[in-house]
C-alpha cells in the first residue's frame, strides 16, 4: 500500500475527541483518586484532578506556576502531516487555555507498525514539530508504542 493511497481515518474507530471516555464513566474511574493529596508537595496545586480542566497548574513560587497537560487522539484527517499539526496545536492549546506559555513538549505516538508505513509516522511527528517550532516550544523526544490503532499527541509543560 502506498502512502498516497492510505486514509488514516479508516484506522480509527472514532475521530479525535469522539474517542474520549464519556464524562460520567470517567468520573467513576477517577472517583477514588480525587482529593488524594501528596505529603510534602513540591508546590501548591491550583488546578488538579478534581477540577476536570484542560491542564494541571502548580504554583512553585510567588508569580510562577507550572502548567502540565497530555493530549492525544486518533486521526481526524487523512494527511499525516496535517494530523500531526492538529494534534500538536490541540495539546499546546490546553496550556494556553490555562493562561500559560508552552515551554517543552514530548511526543506521544501509538503506531500500527505492521500495517502503516513508518514514513507516515515520521510525517505526523514532523507536523507536530513544526507547530511546536512556530509556538516557540521545544520538542524534546517522547514515547512510542506499537498499537493497533494510530494515536498521536503530546505531553506539554508550560509556565504561567
Please give the residue ranges for each predicted region.
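N-terminal glycine-rich phosphate/pyrophosphate-binding loops that anchor nucleotide-derived ligands
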Residues: 2-97, 140
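Glycine-rich anion-binding loops of enzyme active sites
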Residues: 62-76, 85, 101-160
Amino acid at each position: 500500500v502506498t502512502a498516497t493511497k492510505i486514509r488514516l481515518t479508516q484506522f480509527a474507530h472514532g475521530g479525535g475527541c469522539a474517542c474520549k471516555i464519556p464524562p460520567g464513566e470517567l468520573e467513576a474511574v477517577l472517583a477514588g483518586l480525587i482529593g488524594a493529596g501528596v505529603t510534602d508537595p513540591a508546590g501548591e496545586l491550583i488546578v488538579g484532578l478534581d477540577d476536570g480542566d484542560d491542564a494541571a497548574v502548580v504554583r512553585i513560587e510567588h508569580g510562577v506556576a507550572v502548567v502540565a497537560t497530555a493530549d492525544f487522539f486518533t486521526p481526524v484527517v487523512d494527511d499525516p502531516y496535517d494530523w500531526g499539526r492538529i494534534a500538536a496545536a490541540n495539546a499546546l492549546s490546553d496550556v494556553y487555555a490555562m493562561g500559560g506559555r508552552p515551554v517543552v513538549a514530548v511526543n506521544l505516538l501509538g503506531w500500527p507498525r505492521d500495517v502503516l508505513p513508518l514514513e507516515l509516522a515520521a510525517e505526523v511527528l514532523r507536523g507536530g514539530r513544526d507547530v511546536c517550532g512556530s509556538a516557540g516550544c521545544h520538542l524534546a523526544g517522547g514515547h512510542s508504542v506499537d498499537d493497533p490503532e494510530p494515536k498521536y499527541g503530546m505531553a506539554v509543560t508550560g509556565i504561567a
